[in-house]
């Protein structure tokens, strides 16, 4: 009695499940057909029981195989994703099938171990190849993602920069547009450089003008601070030689008269209570001579040299008196000496120092009034 082909290959390889089912069904039919033929020939009852038991075993095996194949199909996606779990499950199923087959089959039929090792090696190789392919694809995808993201980000930043500068737009693929943008950029840079050059030239000229104005002002100040030379005319230098000798003699006689009057007043108005103080008046008229300028009408003919003799005769008839210019210091000095003012103040100060009154102003006024009284009395006598 022939048995169907090796069932372990059908259980291990999922792609051959429909062929295995077909072979199992055909084997069961052949067994029934053979059993009927043996019965018609006139076999014994034990052979009929054996055929019926084999048919029942074949039907049970086909039902079990269909259920196991459905489980394998449902677990295929998870097995592909989890290779270790799929290997363990496949090994468990193979061991269970082998144990069931050994119990159901006669002892003379044994499975070849070489075929099992071959199928298990193929399955392991396919699973390892699939896992390596998936790992390689994931690594390549991971490598591609950062490079693509960096390229995209760099292109995006470049586009934003161009948009900010104003010479890159959405339709930048046009080469003419790019050349126009470059030309605009060049013109803009040229305009900026020309503007800076204009500023430099302006400030340079301004600094030059300021330096020139400063030098001009310094020169003007230097010229203004310089001393101008003085020029004396001959007429002014010769004026001292024209001083009249008569005025010198008159001034000398007046000074002598003042000296005599001063001595007479000091002797007559001396007081017993007052301390003796020498009353000498020093004048600076002895070493220096008083110079007076006299302008006469003798200078008039100088201006009338080209005029007629009749005009010169009329001018000689109307001569003005000489004009004398005196020094104000000498005039004040003569006034003080004439009224004896120095002697009066000398007496008042001497009395003030000697008496030391509480009210010096009132004391000085009282002294002046007493002097006025004495003068009036003297004049009346």
Swiss-Prot record:
CDD domains: DD_TEX55 (cd22975). Residues 134-143 have a biased composition (Acidic residues). Its main location: nucleus. SUPFAM superfamilies: Dimerization-anchoring domain of cAMP-dependent PK regulatory subunit (SSF47391). Testis-specific. One of its GO terms (cellular component) is nucleus. Keywords: Nucleus. It holds the Pfam family Tex55. Residues 1-176, 292-317 are annotated as: Disordered. It is found in: Nucleus. Residues 307-317 have a biased composition (Low complexity). The keyword Membrane does not apply. Residues 104-113, 147-163, 292-302 have a biased composition (Polar residues). It comes from the Eukaryota. Residues 8-24, 65-103, 114-125 have a biased composition (Basic and acidic residues). This is Testis-specific expressed protein 55. It comes from Mus musculus. The lineage of its organism: Eukaryota, Metazoa, Chordata, Craniata, Vertebrata.
């Amino acid at each position: 009695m022939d048995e169907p082909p090796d069932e372990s290959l059908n259980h291990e390889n999922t792609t051959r499940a429909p062929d295995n089912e077909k072979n199992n069904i055909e084997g069961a039919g052949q067994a029934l057909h053979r059993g009927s033929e043996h019965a018609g020939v006139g076999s014994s009852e034990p052979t009929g029981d054996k055929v019926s038991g084999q048919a029942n075993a074949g039907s049970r095996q086909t039902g079990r195989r269909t259920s196991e194949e459905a489980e394998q199909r449902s677990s295929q996606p998870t097995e592909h994703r989890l290779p270790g779990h799929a290997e363990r499950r496949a090994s468990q199923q193979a061991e269970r099938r082998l144990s069931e087959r050994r119990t159901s089959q006669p002892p003379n039929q044994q499975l070849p171990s070489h075929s099992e090792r071959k199928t298990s090696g193929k399955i392991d190789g396919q699973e390892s190849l699939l896992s390596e392919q998936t790992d390689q694809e994931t690594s390549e995808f991971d490598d591609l993602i950062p490079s693509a993201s960096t390229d995209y980000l760099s292109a995006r930043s470049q586009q934003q920069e161009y948009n900010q500068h104003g010479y890159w737009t959405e339709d930048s693929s046009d080469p003419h547009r790019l050349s126009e943008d470059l030309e605009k950029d060049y013109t803009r840079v040229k305009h900026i450089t020309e503007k800076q050059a204009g500023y430099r030239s302006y400030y340079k000229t301004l600094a030059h003008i300021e330096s020139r104005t400063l030098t001009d002002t310094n020169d003007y100040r230097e010229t203004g601070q310089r001393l101008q030379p003085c020029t004396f005319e001959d007429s002014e230098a010769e004026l001292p030689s024209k001083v009249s000798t008569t005025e010198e003699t008159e001034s000398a006689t007046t000074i002598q008269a003042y000296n005599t009057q001063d001595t007479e007043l000091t002797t007559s108005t001396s007081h017993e209570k007052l301390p003796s103080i020498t009353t000498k008046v020093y004048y600076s008229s002895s070493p220096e001579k008083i110079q007076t300028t006299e302008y006469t009408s003798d200078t008039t003919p100088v201006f009338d040299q080209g005029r007629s003799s009749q005009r010169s005769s009329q001018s000689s008839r109307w001569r003005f008196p000489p004009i004398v210019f005196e020094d104000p210091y000498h005039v004040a000095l003569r006034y003080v000496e004439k009224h004896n003012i120095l002697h009066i103040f000398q007496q008042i100060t001497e009395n003030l120092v000697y008496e030391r009154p509480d009210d010096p102003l009132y004391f000085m006024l009282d002294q002046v009034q007493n002097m006025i009284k004495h003068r009036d009395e003297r004049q009346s006598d």
